A protein has these predicted regions:
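ER/Golgi luminal nucleotide-sugar-dependent glycosyltransferases, focusing on the catalytic module
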Residues: 1-184
């Protein structure tokens, strides 16, 4: 069974040894590949502020992610400018992004969904090689190996597995922190 891990979103500056330890835990004993898609600019969470923080123009996410993930089976990595993303948003999306009428969770979902869809496209040419696909974030730490779970049972299931176990939060919400399953 082959697994694709899609790391998507904004890279956060977390100690490299901690991230590597986390990825080792997550991937232990698995046949896997990693795909990464991020903004050029590393930063901080946009979703936990009343005001949108200014994005740093360090433009070194590619280098940092490459450095961290080089010890793992990193297949593809791509970054792009967050500022260019904002400039090139279609008009209806710009109106949502700049609106005071939408919940900030809706507003900040735009860049999250965008990077996730771009990361998914990185593995599309190889999609037939993967039995399971999991979405991961750069700022999440994984304390247990994924192989602890009955992954073979996931193969023929159309269930999307996620951290909203027992619908502990909102009943119909799938949190973007970690989710995945089979291609069904």
């Amino acid at each position: 069974m082959k697994i694709a891990f899609l790391f998507a979103g904004q890279y956060r500056d977390i100690p490299k040894d901690l991230i590597r330890y986390s990825i080792e835990n997550l991937t232990k004993g698995l046949d896997y590949s990693i795909f990464c898609y991020s903004w050029d600019e590393p930063g901080e969470s946009l979703d936990h502020r009343e005001e949108i923080p200014k994005i740093k123009n360090d433009n070194n996410s590619f280098e940092q992610i490459s450095n961290i993930f080089s010890a793992f089976n990193l297949k593809k990595i791509h970054t792009e400018s967050y500022n260019n993303f904002l400039i090139n948003l279609p008009k209806p999306h710009k109106e949502i992004f700049n609106s005071k009428f939408y919940h900030k969770g809706t507003i900040f979902a735009l860049p999250q969904i965008y990077t996730l869809s771009k990361c998914y496209k990185l593995q599309e040419n190889d999609a037939s090689h993967y039995d399971l696909i999991f979405r991961c974030r750069f700022d999440s730490l994984y304390l247990h190996p994924l192989k602890l779970y009955p992954l073979r049972n996931f193969l023929n299931s159309s269930t999307l597995y996620n951290i909203n176990f027992g619908r502990a939060y909102y009943p119909n919400r799938i949190y973007d922190i970690f989710f995945g399953g089979s291609k069904k």
